């Protein structure tokens, strides 16, 4: 087969405008496939997605998913090495492209004119599902509206692409038939060109760099253009699309009515924490919809004194989402806000909308009085006394261990969960990555049980959205046999443990590959950290202070972080470190700069590390409940008490949560996916 025959084959099989088809039947097929596309789209969004979210919570389905992710598609498999496996964006792109391509091409019989008409009609048919995905909160069960935004973005991209192709092919069809000038003078076609221009404007401003440059411009263009597109498409489409327009208007107006219903005005108090963080407070009674679960969020808008500006803010609700850092029963609602573009003025009025509940499937509020005699609680560490059961901190927790990673102001998501999970006897670890050690001052404004909290101070400059957590995805065959794990305890000493020691009696034993080897062969290190020499650490003094003067001076913070030469004084010696309140001395600053607080007090139970954490086998061992006490001579305690049972049954009670910057959430999600664990991420970044 030569090149000429290949070209001729394509010419014969490619769609063409020369196909002779009855105009009436062509119109019927275009309407038929667009309606089927609309119906199936709503079935996928309203039935299949919630059903999948529900099935993931069942033990049987979790075991299947765990086996596939942790064993079949582990790091040795070729599937794991592909970008498609890890990138949700690529998966959605492929699914949306195949889905729409089927309805565009199926049954067209090579008629390019019918395909062109279908592109326009299907892009209109996808508008109601596209707008439905933006509803806040989502009416779908077991579904957080933030989790639907990636699907919303890819459907919108497909709609824009089909609109462009629809316009281009129609212009070409008019040109070859010498009707371009005549057709383009008709008003409906002009409306179509204007709608395409608005689609392109939305696409350009939706690029990530444009969004980060000016989110306000992106939002205004997005909101106004959406309404205008609905109007222009209504008058452009032939035959009419009254039912599509009705659905679109109902969705948008319903969202407006609900937003106004849960919006109120409050007067806030601003408490400065550091140069980068502030605490916003207002009474719980001013919140229109009281929160039920911890980790919810609300949306805030400025209350303008000018009536016209207030009307405009209701017309185009440019709101900022913030996670509620206080627990639902507190009298004050507290928000930890990163100082930036959002203006913060104490004793001023703001519009507040919400609260919006999180989608944490393992936690719920008891709806009926708890009977002490029943065995509804599977947690053996839970105190079922009547006084604690009647506490506002009492929740039904369907998890035994919760591992959380947050970055920057994402600590708002972790603090209320940490307090409630600790109260209900759940083993919990909270890793907070922060750039500035002064942000630790925010902990003193919250009444909390900080057991299980670890703070990693990167000491680097930049935007909060650039905060990351490391997950090095590689496989070393030698590590399966003898893997040395380096970790830093609260006393600053380095403990090295091999994988074999976890299940041994003290004598070396040959290791056989097991179902946990894939993740337990990874190294858990603290990036850019060199443990200090013991001789360099002086004895702990009576003041029990932590001095960061040489660790994070302004002139050396970037250099020291890169070389891992951070230094501590009188803070990493003795097992009692971080078990009592600590006092941090800030680094020396330039005299010209504003004076910083003399000392920063850290609550008891908090562990502080330097650098950036790396997720690995030590963290997975913690999820498996196989971590060892480094100070215990005998390693008999390292045996997993229930090693005979199916470990997937236990891991179904383990959850991994992440909140904050996109990079941190993606790394945590990949680590949790490779381990076959439940994962929930929450990010307001678009």
UniProtKB/Swiss-Prot annotation:
**Residues in the Cytoplasmic compartment per record:** 1-35, 111-128, 179-186, 238-267, 424-686
- Where along the chain is NAD(+) bound? 442-450
Composition bias (Polar residues) maps to: 501-516
Q: Which InterPro entries match?
A: Fe3_Rdtase_TM_dom, RBOH/FRE
Which regions span the lipid bilayer? 36-56, 90-110, 129-149, 158-178, 187-207, 217-237, 268-288, 403-423
User: Ferric oxidoreductase domain location, by residue?
Assistant: 119-666
**One GO BP annotation of this record:** intracellular monoatomic cation homeostasis
Which keywords describe this protein according to UniProt?
A: Electron transport, FAD, Flavoprotein, Glycoprotein, Ion transport, Iron, Iron transport, Membrane, NAD, Oxidoreductase, Transmembrane, Transmembrane helix, Transport
Q: Where does it live in the cell?
A: Membrane
Residue intervals annotated with topology Extracellular = 57-89, 150-157, 208-216, 289-402
The UniProt annotation places FAD binding at: 320-326
- Is Cell cycle given among the entry's keywords? no
Q: Which GO terms describe its molecular function?
A: ferric-chelate reductase (NADH) activity; ferric-chelate reductase activity; oxidoreductase activity, acting on metal ions
The chemistry this enzyme catalyses reads: 2 a Fe(II)-siderophore + NAD(+) + H(+) = 2 a Fe(III)-siderophore + NADH
Described purpose of this protein according to its UniProt entry: Required for the uptake of Fe(3+) ions. May participate in the transport of electrons from cytoplasm to an extracellular substrate (Fe(3+) ion) via FAD and heme intermediates. Involved in iron homeostasis.
- Name it: Probable ferric reductase transmembrane component 8
Task: Tell me which species this is from.
Answer: Saccharomyces cerevisiae (strain ATCC 204508 / S288c)
Specify the taxonomic lineage: Eukaryota, Fungi, Dikarya, Ascomycota, Saccharomycotina
């Amino acid at each position: 087969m030569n090149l000429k025959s290949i070209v001729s084959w394509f010419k014969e099989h490619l769609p063409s405008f020369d196909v002779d088809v009855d105009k009436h039947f062509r119109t019927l097929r275009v309407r038929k496939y667009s309606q089927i596309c609309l119906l199936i789209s709503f079935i996928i969004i309203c039935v299949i997605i919630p059903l999948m979210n529900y099935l993931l919570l069942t033990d049987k389905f979790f075991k299947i998913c765990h086996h596939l992710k942790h064993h079949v598609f582990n790091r040795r498999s070729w599937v794991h090495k592909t970008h498609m496996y890890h990138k949700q964006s690529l998966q959605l792109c492929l699914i949306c492209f195949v889905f729409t391509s089927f309805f565009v091409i199926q049954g067209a019989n090579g008629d390019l004119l019918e395909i062109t008409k279908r592109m326009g009609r299907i892009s209109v048919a996808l508008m109601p599902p596209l707008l439905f995905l933006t509803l806040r909160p989502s009416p779908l069960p077991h579904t957080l509206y933030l989790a639907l935004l990636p699907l919303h973005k890819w459907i919108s991209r497909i709609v824009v692409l089909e609109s462009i192709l629809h316009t281009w092919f129609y212009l070409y069809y008019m040109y070859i038939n010498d009707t371009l000038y005549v057709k383009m003078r008709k008003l409906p076609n002009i409306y179509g060109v204007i709608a395409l221009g608005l689609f392109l404007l939305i696409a350009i401003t939706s690029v990530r760099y444009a969004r980060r440059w000016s989110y306000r411009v992106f939002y205004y263009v997005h909101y106004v253009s959406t309404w205008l597109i609905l109007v222009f498409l209504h008058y452009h489409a032939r035959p009419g699309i009254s039912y599509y327009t009705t659905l679109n208007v109902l969705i948008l107006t319903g969202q407006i009515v609900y937003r106004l219903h849960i919006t109120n005005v409050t007067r806030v108090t601003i408490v400065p924490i550091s140069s980068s963080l502030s605490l916003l407070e207002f009474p719980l009674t001013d919140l229109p919809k009281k929160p039920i679960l911890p980790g919810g969020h609300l949306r805030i808008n400025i209350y303008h004194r000018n009536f016209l500006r207030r009307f405009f803010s209701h017309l185009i609700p440019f709101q900022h989402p913030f996670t509620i850092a206080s627990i639902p029963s507190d009298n004050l609602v507290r928000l930890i806000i990163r100082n930036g573009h959002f203006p913060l003025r104490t004793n001023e009025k703001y519009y507040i909308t919400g609260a919006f509940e999180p989608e944490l499937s393992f936690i719920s509020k008891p709806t009926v009085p708890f009977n002490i005699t029943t065995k509804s609680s599977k947690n053996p560490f839970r105190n079922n006394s009547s006084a604690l059961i009647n506490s506002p901190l009492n929740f039904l927790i369907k998890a035994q261990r919760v591992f959380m990673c947050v970055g920057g102001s994402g600590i708002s998501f972790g603090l209320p969960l940490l307090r409630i999970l600790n109260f209900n006897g759940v083993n919990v670890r909270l890793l907070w990555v922060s750039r500035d050690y002064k942000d630790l001052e925010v902990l003193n404004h919250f009444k909390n049980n900080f057991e299980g909290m670890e703070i990693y101070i990167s000491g680097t400059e930049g935007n909060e959205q650039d905060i990351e957590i490391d997950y090095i995805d590689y496989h070393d065959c030698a590590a399966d046999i003898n893997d040395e794990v380096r970790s830093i305890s609260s006393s600053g000493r380095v403990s090295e443990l091999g994988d074999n020691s976890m299940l041994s009696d003290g004598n070396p034993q040959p290791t056989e590959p097991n179902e946990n080897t894939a993740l337990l062969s990874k190294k858990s290190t603290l990036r850019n950290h060199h443990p200090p020499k013991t001789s360099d650490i002086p004895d702990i003094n009576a003041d029990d202070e932590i001095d960061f003067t040489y660790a994070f001076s302004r002139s050396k913070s970037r250099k020291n972080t890169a070389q891992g030469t951070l230094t501590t004084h009188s803070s990493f010696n003795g097992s009692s470190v971080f078990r009592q309140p600590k006092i941090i001395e800030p680094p020396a600053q330039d005299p010209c700069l504003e004076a910083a607080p003399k000392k920063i007090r850290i609550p008891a139970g908090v562990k502080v590390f330097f650098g950036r954490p790396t997720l690995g086998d030590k963290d997975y061992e913690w999820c498996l409940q196989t971590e060892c006490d480094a100070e215990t001579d005998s390693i008999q305690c390292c045996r997993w008490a229930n090693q005979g049972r199916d470990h997937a049954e236990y891991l179904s009670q383990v959850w991994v949560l992440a909140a904050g910057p996109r990079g941190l959430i993606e790394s945590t999600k990949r680590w949790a996916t490779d381990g076959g664990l439940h994962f929930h991420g929450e990010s307001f970044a678009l």
